[in-house]
Amino acid sequence: MKLRGLYAITDSQLLTGKFLSYVEAALDGGVTLLQYRDKTGDDSRRLREATELLKLCERYKTRLIINDDAELAARLGVGVHLGQTDGSLPDARALLGHKAIVGATCHGQLELAEQAKADGATYVAFGRFFNSQTKPGAPAVPLDLIAQVRARVHLPIAVIGGITLENAPQLVEHGADLLAVVHGLFGAETPQEVTRRAKAFMALL
């Protein structure tokens, strides 16, 4: 599957009071994948918000990904992104079917990407590459890892961690396919600025 472009990731705290308006603004600017990420554990709210996002994604012809919840993804008929401690990738693939997008966090380890490919991943994700507000304690990953992954794991490569319009070009130059962005997109003051940033990120790829 060819995946290339902006991978927008929601943050419930960052988007308090402006969740749908900012997400729609991003979709209006152009988003390849949208990941719904909510770590609160409020299942009813998660289902409601994910359902609302799916409606928006269908309108804008964008693929929705659920973070760390294969059952919710299956319920909505969308993809899933799994961290290293968030359940079995083969089980998620079996649950969602062969056409679903299933992404895997690989931190900074090439071996994890090779295993993810063997387990049926659609794309592999690496990071953090820069200082991240979402996961400030995560270990840094060197830029040259991207080329190593590209040479050995022939899957789309998502990069994450403190990505902004200023530092994103070097990630693309090193071979990244998907720019996974949270604060660098949704930390804007207005929906119009979110749209502008989304367009600018997409123009890099």
Curated annotation (Swiss-Prot):
Keyword annotations of the record: Magnesium, Metal-binding, Thiamine biosynthesis, Transferase
Gene3D superfamilies hit by this protein: Aldolase class I (3.20.20.70)
EC id: 2.5.1.3
Job description of the protein: Condenses 4-methyl-5-(beta-hydroxyethyl)thiazole monophosphate (THZ-P) and 2-methyl-4-amino-5-hydroxymethyl pyrimidine pyrophosphate (HMP-PP) to form thiamine monophosphate (TMP).
Sites where the protein binds 2-[(2R,5Z)-2-carboxy-4-methylthiazol-5(2H)-ylidene]ethyl phosphate: S132, Q133, T134, G162
Pathway assigned to this chain's UniProt record: Cofactor biosynthesis; thiamine diphosphate biosynthesis; thiamine phosphate from 4-amino-2-methyl-5-diphosphomethylpyrimidine and 4-methyl-5-(2-phosphoethyl)-thiazole: step 1/1
EC class (word): transferase
Source organism of this protein record: Pseudomonas syringae pv. tomato (strain ATCC BAA-871 / DC3000)
An annotated Gene Ontology molecular function: thiamine-phosphate diphosphorylase activity
HAMAP family per record: TMP_synthase
Binding site for 4-amino-2-methyl-5-(diphosphooxymethyl)pyrimidine: Q35, Y36, R37, D38, K39, N67, T105, K135
Cofactors required: Mg(2+)
Entry-linked InterPro entries: Aldolase_TIM, ThiamineP_synth_sf, ThiamineP_synth_TenI, TMP_synthase
GO biological process: thiamine biosynthetic process; thiamine diphosphate biosynthetic process
Entry-linked CDD domains: TMP_TenI
Keyword Magnesium set for record: yes
A UniProt-annotated Pfam family: TMP-TENI
Residue numbers binding Mg(2+): D68, D86
Family: Belongs to the thiamine-phosphate synthase family.
Co-factor binding comment: Binds 1 Mg(2+) ion per subunit.
Protein name: Thiamine-phosphate synthase
Cellular component, GO, one term: cytoplasm
